[in-house]
Amino acid sequence: HSDAIFTDNYSRFRKQMAVKKYLNSVLT
């Protein structure tokens, strides 16, 4: 169970980082 929670949080974190990177590339 803890692995599933960790993976879920990790994928969500990765998505947030990808979105930030995308926004940065669009805004600059």
UniProtKB/Swiss-Prot annotation:
Signal peptide: none annotated. GO terms for cellular component: extracellular region; neuron projection. Keywords: Amidation, Hormone, Secreted. The keyword Transferase does not apply. InterPro entries: Glucagon_GIP_secretin_VIP (IPR000532), VIP/GHRH-like (IPR046963). Disulfide bonds: none annotated. GO terms for biological process: adenylate cyclase-activating G protein-coupled receptor signaling pathway; epinephrine secretion; mRNA stabilization; prolactin secretion; regulation of protein localization. GO terms for molecular function: neuropeptide hormone activity; peptide hormone receptor binding; type 1 vasoactive intestinal polypeptide receptor binding. The keyword Amino-acid biosynthesis does not apply. The modification Threonine amide is found at T28. It comes from the Eukaryota. It is found in: Secreted. Belongs to the glucagon family. PANTHER family: GLUCAGON-FAMILY NEUROPEPTIDE, VIP PEPTIDES. This is Vasoactive intestinal peptide. It comes from Amia calva (Bowfin).
